[in-house]
Amino acid sequence: LYGGQQAVALQTNDQLMTAETFDDAIVAYRSGGPVHIRDIGRAIEAPQDTTLGGWLNGKPAILLAVFRTPGANVMSTVEAIKKALPQLRASLPPGINVAIVSDRTQTIAASVADVRFTLLLTIALVIGVIAFFLRKLWATVIPAISIPISIIGTFAVMYVLGYSLDNLSLMALTIAVGFVVDDAIVMVENIVRHIEGGAAPLQAALDGAGEIGFTILSISISLIAVFIPLFLMGGVVGLLFREFAVTVAVSILVSVIVSLTLTPMLCAKLLPAAGHGKEGRVSRALEAFFTWLVHAYDRGLIVALRHRRITLGVMLATMAATGWFFVVIPKGFFPQQDTGLIVGVSEGAPDISPEGMKQRQQAILEIASRDPAVASAVGYIGPGGPTVTENDGRVFITLKPKGQRNVTADQAIARLTKAVEQVQGMRLYMQAAQDITIGSRLSKTQYQFTLVDIDQSELNFYAQKLMAKLQDLPELTAVASDQEAPGRTLAIQIDRPAAALFGITPATIDDTLYDAFGQRHIARIYTALNEYYVILEVNPQYQLGPNALQRIYVLSQNSTMVPLSQIASLSPAVTPIVVNHQGQFPSVTLSFNLAPDATIGAAVSAVQKATRDLHLPPSIATSFQGNAQAFQSSLSTTPPLILAALFAVYIILGMLYESTIHPLTILSTLPSAGLGALVTLLLIGRPLDVIGIIGIILLIGIVKKNGIMLVDVALEEQRDRGLSSEEAIHHACLLRFRPILMTTMCALFGGVPLMLGTGTGSEIRQPLGYAIVGGLLVSQVLTLFTTPVVFIYMDKIGQALSARSRAKPSRLADAMRIAK
């Protein structure tokens, strides 16, 4: 109200704040007296929805799942939440506590810490290899300097690109350690060789850098070319590994710049002249060992060159074996991780009551809590979030740290699955939470297969038949369906003429039923911190069973109460409690986990065969979803991806050498690496998954450097000294034997910590280590003998083609001759 000088605000006590005040509220007047709520019912303080329930270790709880927004850093997000918790706790009433039940960032932090240790261990191992081969302080320090410089330079580029330091980028840096020292090792070894030949350090640095610069450039550019297909790879997998590829490529690029500039300068300034310093006994012993090793290799090389056809046959057999092993090796998607979290879906009968669901869900949580590997078990029931029906619930089981339990997550799932079988009328489907998941479709188990049809009854019929077949497959376990069994329904058939006699419409009947059983929200209570719904329903004791409808009366037009039974009939029926859709059509999704020792490749093939054997009608469309669909996509793109990497390397090498022949010699080193990687994965019982494929692609870049170093020297010997192809490649093999051995050992020791890692998140890194180590071991043994033979044959082919082109006059020459 506004006066001449002042304004006054109006405020009423229109809001009832407690159940007692609602009890005193007047809703009508009858016979001249007021009718209070307490006269016809009662107001109580109670949960908003009694069909819902949540528990933590046996105590009632409200569960809150927090997800970061796209682009947000999960570690900083969780840290901000933890900082806000004390203030939140202070605002809650006594007796209510807020606790973090499951924190995925702890696993992420542990995994990052483990891979950080792996990175440091790799650096130490690589420096040890350099010291073992060069046996001189500064000759060891100079290549080692390239490691931190390359890593720091990579960090700078990652920062500009907005990348974060996570498992994939750290894994990329770990692998890159073996790459970034290669260039410096080759440069230092060549300069040291000139110094030992009598040259001054400065002159040796100039001569050595000029001599080996093109080789280093060829190695690095062709290595970066390997990652071009990864840069262009589409889909979610491509997005995941684009950062990996960029990280490795940038580190290699920085190392090239360091090796061609800083490394020669340091060699000129820090390396002593020949004869300075006295070699120790260990150094002399190592030098004698390397000399013996070179002589032994020389003897073997002479035999290989003498029996060229046999050696070439070995290489061709290696190529054939690589193709055969690629076909027969089991295929996977991503390694199964043990993140310490198990997520589960509990499913009761479609007509189970909320009270029955609560009792069984609590029994499941109690059984899970008693397991020695479990740190906490939390769950809830009722519609909300990913749960859409009252007979479904969710379970989240946090396992103890790996050091405090003697079972993996999958073993814990198997044990818990057997333990909860004692809970009658409930099924529990569990899966180990994974850091990398594709797709947003939620299912009871890990992999999904969807059927879509326009005819719901036909779809349900064939979905049930297919599910029965899938349950018999040995490759699958925990087969589930989102097709809920029909639930009990009480059909209310309104007698419209009878209702019309009383002036009652169907809408009035619907409103009456909603008032009684629908938990109608009729008001809100607002407080300083919260708001509460005022809910209307009949007394819970009058909601038990179909007989409750006998007590329902409907208000007629003349204000008389008419029994519902007088204007409607009741009949029991069954009906689906949920109908799922995909693309606006009815759908059923069958989900499954993998049986022990089964691969997703075998499971997908088994599901496809079972589907074909069922002879589904043409109207039913089928497709894999989520991880299974991404696996199919990655499986189909793997051969083109590898071929694209080979083609990119061939094009780059062809441009560098201005030849179409010699790049083939270099690429001939690759089949043995692929064979080693595939055989290693087979021997340890691992499938060829996305991580293993990345390892094979990396091997393309690593192994071809051996061929580049040999071909470079051989071509130079032919050009400068006029040697035959056999003499040139023989000399090149002996001259480059030590740097080849050094660079291979550095790359190999870069993969060993990944291969042997057992810490948190090691499951996803191990296939990369196994593929690299196995591929390098086999290729190192074979390519040192097969590459020289291939060079000789390719050189002869090149000479023959050159001679033919010289002998055949060009059309222009013919035209000029005719004109004359």
Where are these regions (language model features)?
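Helix-loop junctions and hydrophobic alpha-helical segments within the transmembrane domains
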Residues: 101, 108, 112, 188, ...
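Membrane-interface helix starts
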Residues: 119-123, 213-214, 276, 302-316, ...
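Transmembrane alpha-helices and their membrane-interface boundaries in multi-pass membrane transporters
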Residues: 177-191, 213-232, 239-283, 395, ...
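Signature of alpha-helical transmembrane segments and their immediate interfacial
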Residues: 212, 281-335, 419-422, 449, ...
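Membrane-helix entry/capping segments
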Residues: 68-72, 78-125, 157, 165, ...
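Hydrophobic transmembrane alpha-helices and their membrane-interface caps
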Residues: 124-193, 200, 232, 250, ...
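Transmembrane helices with small-residue packing motifs
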Residues: 159, 163, 231-240, 275, ...
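Surface-exposed amphipathic alpha-helical segments in non-transmembrane regions
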Residues: 1, 15-50, 57, 72, ...
